[in-house]
Amino acid sequence: MTTFLNINQIRTTFIEFFKKYGHHHASSSSLVPGNDPSLFFVNAGIVQFKDYVRAPETSKYSRVVTCQKCVRAGGKHNDLESVGYTARHHTFFEMLGNFSFGEDNAKADFMQLIWNFLTKELFIDEDRLIVTVYHTDHETAKLWRSIAGLDDSRIIRIKTDDNFWSMGPVGPCGPCTEIFYDHGDKIPGGLPGTKDENGGRYVEIWNIVFMQYEQLNESTRVELAKRCIDTGAGLERIATVLQGVYDNYDIDLFKNLIANIEHLTKIKSVGEANFSHRIIADHLRASAFLIADGVMPSNDGRGYVLRRIMRRAMNQIHQLGCKEPVMHLLVQGLINEMGDFYKELRVRQELITYLLKNEEEKFKTTLSKGLKLLEEESKNLTSGSQLSGHIAFKLYDTYGFPFDLTQDILKKRSISINKTEFDQNMLEQQNRARQLWKGQGSNKEQLLWEKLKEEFRATEFVGYSLCQAEGIVVSLIQDNQYVEYIDINQVDDNNKEFWLITNQTPFYGQSGGQIGDIGIIKNNECTIHVTDTIKLFGCTHVHICKIVSGKINLNAVVHMAIDKQYRTQLQIHHSATHILHAALREILGNHIIQKGSLVAYDYLRFDVSHPTSISKDLLTKIENRVNEIILNNTAVKLRIMPFDQAIAHGAVALFEEKYGDEVRAISIGETSDARYYSFELCGGTHVKYTGDIGAFRILSESAIAAGVRRIEAIAGKHVIKQARQNSELLDLIAEKFSVTKQTIMSKIDGIIEENNLLKKQLHQLKYNQLILCEKDIQNMADNIGKIKLVYKNIEDYDLQIVRKAVSNTTKNIQNLVMVVISNNDKKSTIIIGVSDNITNKIQANNLVKEIINYIGGSGGGSATLAQIGCQYTSKLLDLKNIICKLLAT
């Protein structure tokens, strides 16, 4: 009989079972792939091991077991539209997997282990299991007969690519076999491979891929020298089997999440609301895990996919009638369910909560306007009809409605969207953006990059221990072309830069936030100034050079020397960045994630995830803590160690960085519990002791995106330089005001007080100049019938004074229309006042509308006081005549 296990128990049981049979447990990788730029998100267990598929001998372990976080929402693998409406679609899911790298005879053993796990460990009824194999894979069919005792009726041969996996047009490939669970005849559907296979009765619960071939070209396939096996089982699907349910949303995890949603929204998960609850529960998982792995909501890339997911859920919350943000209140319930295994959820809880609340608040401000437009444009559409793609694009462009959100809203009314029109609008917008971008590379440059990728050479970096070294010039590149030499006599007056690549170098190539070294390369024939060093493809150091004298030839032997003072400042700022990172985590919390950094010669910039601005007091506390670590003069130690060991010891790794099995770990200081104060994986250069940094000073803190703060700071001699400049500035100020440094503030306070008094007096003076009495009116007004018109042009007046003067004048004097034009910096403001006793005939706001029709601009107001703002125009010269005509009619 099948044993009931909750989802956490299944995950643990799976991992422990395969560990018992020689598998190394590898933690789930980040959802942001570090080794595959073609993927938005990790969508399968094999992704983090792709390099081992290509080169199995590089894997430290021959067998691995994982539970991998996956997201399918965007690009080729996009389940977003179906989520909530089917039994098994998710944006976020967990993939159980076990893998073999380079074992020649693991096939039978893997099949036996998987069958035993399902039938003997989980006690799944084997009579409910059937398998599929690729139609020519007789070996696997034979093994299923011997291992599981399956007869041919339960071994289904499939001819389609569903049962043959490949990495691409060329590369590793092989047949796969799938295990299906029969949910019984109460569920409609036929066997895999039949026309009714999509009915749902038979659900795939495990896929086993045997990578035993290599596709060389379209027609040639050969045996792989080293075979691999990739298996995957959806955790949610396994849970349905063990918990006796058919629908993934009925397993314990989702039942608990949906119960929380019911509690907060006060709406039961029945009828149409059931779809909403399922969407919210699924998208909550995806949003929280993406944020925990460093993705921030934005308008492009991964951040936009996250925003789409969040807004789709938030719209469902709105549809349930919730007026206030709700999604962030569900985070604690999710952490209660999944936070013990995925500790990053607990660490990033504050950030996840803040971003969900902030996004929902922002979205609510535009949601009602967008829904109003959508309702207006679709009110006459009937079931089966189509909304214009232009309207869908306007909703996207103006109100932040992702396409699939509009699609989701209309789905309930069986209305579709003209996707072709939407895509055309999107394409036109992208083309306009491209036309504004002036940095496109030439075809020649593109060809160079392609050739570099094909022929790149790894540069041996010797700069950790040496400041000088000999090297052989292996490439010279100028004007996007390979050249044999660079000659000072053939260089034009601009002395164009060129690229120089050597077999080894002491020059650090820009990476990990640290900018590249500068220095000199020379031999008996030439002297070259290195203005920068970059690193391509993760291993090729490219020196950006200008020739000073002589001629440099390909294959020449050169002496290379970095600028030691420049390197020292880079080391100082890099080590200071590590200490700053540790201080931020210590004082603000472990939710802090590094989002970017720049380590320069004269300053550092550090971007981190943090929900709110950092107060001045906290910045002072952080700065003091960094300086305290510096003054302790503790050792900065380098350790070369296995990646897993470094992570186990608490090393901080960047989410999007790709690490090898061996890593450089930089430790700084120790805490009372014998842990390092700072412990990070880092390929940069550092000081030997924190005292070498000297001092640290934060210059600024600001927001650069939702939930991302930027800190700029200086260290070392630059702190001393700034302190000296500040002191000299104080001396100048004290001298200017004939006071001591100690009394500068009281002097400034006195000046501010005096300035405020003078401002007040000036305002009163200008007000007195504008306020008019009956006698003034008689002398300066134009009489238009019984109406008196006062018309004035002024410059550089505070508009508040003008409004007050016009309002008070028209209140005190009857039958008056007062018009004042204030001109400031090519902009004009027109203030119009009308006496209350004539507003039955003339209204200030109506005069404004008529004037705007003539001169442009915008404005409004009341019957007695109104205002127009516009760019200065020559039409203003005739404005008095226009107003006279309006008053005369």
Swiss-Prot record:
PROSITE patterns: AA_TRNA_LIGASE_II_ALA. GO terms for cellular component: cytosol. It is found in: Cytoplasm. It comes from the Bacteria. GO terms for biological process: alanyl-tRNA aminoacylation; negative regulation of DNA-templated transcription. Zn(2+) binds at residues 574, 578, 682, 686. Binds 1 zinc ion per subunit. It catalyses: tRNA(Ala) + L-alanine + ATP = L-alanyl-tRNA(Ala) + AMP + diphosphate. Its main location: cytoplasm. The keyword Secreted does not apply. Keywords: Aminoacyl-tRNA synthetase, ATP-binding, Cytoplasm, Ligase, Metal-binding, Nucleotide-binding, Protein biosynthesis, RNA-binding, tRNA-binding, Zinc. Its EC number is 6.1.1.7. InterPro entries: aa-tRNA-synth_II/BPL/LPL, Ala-tRNA-lgiase_IIc, Ala-tRNA-ligase_IIc_anticod-bd, Ala-tRNA-synth_IIc_core, Ala-tRNA-synth_IIc_N, Ala-tRNA_ligase, Ala_tRNA_ligase_euk/bac, DHHA1_dom. One of its GO terms (molecular function) is tRNA binding. SUPFAM superfamilies: Class II aaRS and biotin synthetases (SSF55681), Putative anticodon-binding domain of alanyl-tRNA synthetase (AlaRS) (SSF101353), ThrRS/AlaRS common domain (SSF55186), Translation proteins (SSF50447). Its cofactor is Zn(2+). It is an enzyme of class 6 (ligase). HAMAP family: Ala_tRNA_synth_B (MF_00036_B). Belongs to the class-II aminoacyl-tRNA synthetase family. Catalyzes the attachment of alanine to tRNA(Ala) in a two-step reaction: alanine is first activated by ATP to form Ala-AMP and then transferred to the acceptor end of tRNA(Ala). Also edits incorrectly charged Ser-tRNA(Ala) and Gly-tRNA(Ala) via its editing domain. Consists of three domains; the N-terminal catalytic domain, the editing domain and the C-terminal C-Ala domain. The editing domain removes incorrectly charged amino acids, while the C-Ala domain, along with tRNA(Ala), serves as a bridge to cooperatively bring together the editing and aminoacylation centers thus stimulating deacylation of misacylated tRNAs. This is Alanine--tRNA ligase. The gene is alaS.
